[in-house]
Amino acid sequence: MRPLFIRNASQLVTLAGSSTAPLVKEKMNELHIIENGSVWVEDGKIAAVGTDEELSQQFQERIAEAEIVDATGKTVTPGLVDPHTHFVYAGSRESEFAMRLSGATYMEIMNAGGGIHATTKATREASKETLYEESKRRLDQFLLHGVTTVEAKSGYGLSIEHEVKQLTVAKQLDETHPVDVVSTFMGAHAVPAEWKDNPDGFVRVIVEEMIPKVSELGLAEFNDVFCERGVFTPEQARIILEAGKAYGLMPKIHADEIEPYGGAELAAEVGAVSADHLLRASDEGIRRMAEKGVIAVLLPGTAFFLMTKAANARKIIDAGAAVALSTDCNPGSSPTVSLPLIMNLGCLQMGMTPAEALAAVTINAAHAINRGHEIGSIEVGKKADLVLFDVPNYMQLIYHYGMNHTDTVVKNGRVVVKSGRLCY
């Protein structure tokens, strides 16, 4: 592989210095920007970072052998990281959009057989090949929007056979697509129709059958639960998360999205890597998360699409908890792949600064999927995952919403998007 020399960026936003822990409080505003910055890449890794003058001198005898990427007038950031998605699914749910506009709530639609249950039916019925192709198209769109690593949850199978099918497709995508796919088992996404009269029985199936099988096959790193009234209680969620820990699956939790339900407190209790949503989390729950180092993954696109009040990122940041942002890409409550849009919503709806929003989709998002040591910032030794945005500064990326500013994407030192087009 030829060396890659990315030269003369208007802004090189490195976010250097937080590979061992996420950024918190005022540190989220410290982006460590290099004007007229350049990056030298060797064998898929970042080998040097500095001004163009510094690197041109350092590598003057090797520039002729390198592939040159001219970043003049552009902003270079770490590859974006999406730490919470449900992008491996079949079907679509645009009919529910009209239902919600007529006044139906998320839980009303779900209890009527729509929502997660509708996507479960479509995903169960889809062949593995169909599921792969539909999901690959979404993954291509993530890449075109600057995402180089994405978390993918199961949870639209809700049986051993179909959960394994979803996770197998996610693994195949990780192996065949430039974007790294980090898998989360979420058999506890909903209680399927066949278990609606015996939810505790379904919990036993998750604990005694699904988790052991997923662990045996090596299909996931994390274990997630939708802890909400009418879905899984805190007691049921605790059982599922502790069972996952026993099999080496790190806990995550969908917490306090619809009402304060003790999800944030439970996340702190079980040592979750992250607690996600948190629209209605209690102050005490947030305090405990901050104390235990649980990352708050906030999903403003979901609140926007469901027309509800978003989580209070300002309060969570000021409380000392690390904050990441994510699309929550899914067919029912956030059908988007655009992290730049999510950054804009994080500022407008959640009280974040633009710098905090960018940190939340790079280094903090990387820590939310246990990858902060290898991605999320532009530092020597890390993966050469980089994005060139066709804007002169990072503020424009967030301010000028509604269009895709991605020009070039580098994944593991290889150009995979050029002039806004896939080239892998």
UniProtKB/Swiss-Prot annotation:
Localization per record: Cytoplasm
Catalysed transformations (reactions): 4-imidazolone-5-propanoate + H2O = N-formimidoyl-L-glutamate
Binding site for Fe(3+): 84, 86, 254, 328
Protein residues bound to Zn(2+): 84, 86, 254, 328
Functional pathway: Amino-acid degradation; L-histidine degradation into L-glutamate; N-formimidoyl-L-glutamate from L-histidine: step 3/3
Binding site for 4-imidazolone-5-propanoate: 93, 156, 189, 257, 333
One Pfam family from the record: Amidohydro_1
Binding site for N-formimidoyl-L-glutamate: 156, 330, 332
Biological process per Gene Ontology, one example term: L-histidine catabolic process to glutamate and formate
Alphabetical keyword list: Cytoplasm, Histidine metabolism, Hydrolase, Iron, Metal-binding, Zinc
Cofactor comment: Binds 1 zinc or iron ion per subunit.
InterPro entries attached to this UniProt entry: Amidohydro-rel, HutI, Metal-dep_hydrolase_composite, Metal_Hydrolase
Cofactor(s) recorded in Swiss-Prot or TrEMBL: Zn(2+); Fe(3+)
Predominant subcellular localization, coarse grouping: cytoplasm
Entry-linked NCBIfam families: hutI
Family designation: Belongs to the metallo-dependent hydrolases superfamily. HutI family.
Name under which the protein is recorded: Imidazolonepropionase
Gene name, Swiss-Prot/TrEMBL: hutI
